[in-house]
């Protein structure tokens, strides 16, 4: 009975639009840009057999209530079938696809409990994993003895090429008839659907309005392209050449590795390893700075558990999330995953002046408490005020402040400091060639823009929105200062 219930939950679990099953064979997603041509122009952009299963009534998706958002589509049944027959289990969650990609959502109310609750189980046998440090070890070991792909992996830089090693294993998995990722790969985003900046063109990178980030992405693109040219030359064996016949295919695989890799410590028997892992189904969990889920390794049966937080009330339809990179600014999230947010509580800007405001006064105005690394907002004291969000928390961390328990703040001096800090913020905004409003209009006017182009515009817009939020927060601060 328990297994029947878990299968019922799984019927809504897998979000995807297949790229096209054709007689049981699916062509791999094709990247959109020609890297060799772009390189000559000074630009550096960047089969899967279906399982035969007998009809089974529980595989039919149950009639569900209308989604709170009409933009969300339920998952393709094939997505959960290929996992269920391989011991993947999901409890009380469903996978859906929206305009911004895939996500995992609660299919029923999850009441708060004293202990964390398992919502997903994925066995080790379905993962692609590699040890973080040399010597490279795979769990499970899918590379036959003597296969040249191991020599290619062994030639990578141990310090910086972790993504290339995972990409090589991913491509090798696609080439094996009996490997799960040959099926699962059909549900991965194609190159024109992926927001990773590894796939960005020079035109896309120019929209970032961030020279440092542009330089970093160009270096990564060059590193990956050079590696492909070195190891996929005309003289390589066919078993290697067919893995990535063109650089676009290889860069797409590296982008998948970067955006879907999870690093964690595992134990198999007595062997404890720090692994880089590509975990199917768990890689559909989106990011949040206030996640309601976390990942846990269960060593007794070599399972990865996705667990909901203890004591947290989750309503039906609420998205299940994890925190990808705690404590990282938007530029790091953009470099690694290809997304940003205007409410990142860890974002920061550099102030060059000497003006400072009183820290404790600023925190008390917005009901922010805790140590700097653990700031939180007490919404109960805000009486419905929705102004405070992650950007205000970030402002409390990034604004120049002073604190002295023996000296109270002088309102006139605080207002002077507020004005000087606001002026510096306005100068930062004036240095950008566009405003946040213009960026939003540009996004609204693009009906079918490239994913990487839209991602770049959002990044610069979110930066300006963050600076604008700091200006507004300083306005509220000086208005609420006690005389």
Swiss-Prot record:
Name the positions where S-adenosyl-L-methionine binds. 324
Source organism, top-level taxon: Eukaryota
The knockout note for this entry states: Seedling lethal, even with Suc as a carbon source. Impaired thylakoid formation in the initial process of chloroplast development leading to albino seedlings unable to grow photoautotrophically. Reduced plastid-encoded RNA polymerase (PEP) activity.
Q: What induces it?
A: By light. Induced by cytokinin (e.g. trans-zeatin).
Query: What is this protein called in UniProt?
Result: Protein PLASTID TRANSCRIPTIONALLY ACTIVE 14
Q: What does this protein do?
A: Essential for chloroplast development, especially for thylakoid formation. Involved in plastid gene expression, probably by maintaining plastid-encoded RNA polymerase (PEP) activity.
Its EC number is: 2.1.1.-
What Gene Ontology terms describe where this protein resides (cellular component)? chloroplast nucleoid; chloroplast thylakoid; plastid-encoded plastid RNA polymerase complex
| Species annotation | Arabidopsis thaliana
Quaternary assembly: Component of the transcriptionally active chromosome (TAC) complexes. Interacts with PTAC12/HMR/PAP5 and PTAC7. Binds to SL1/MTERF3.
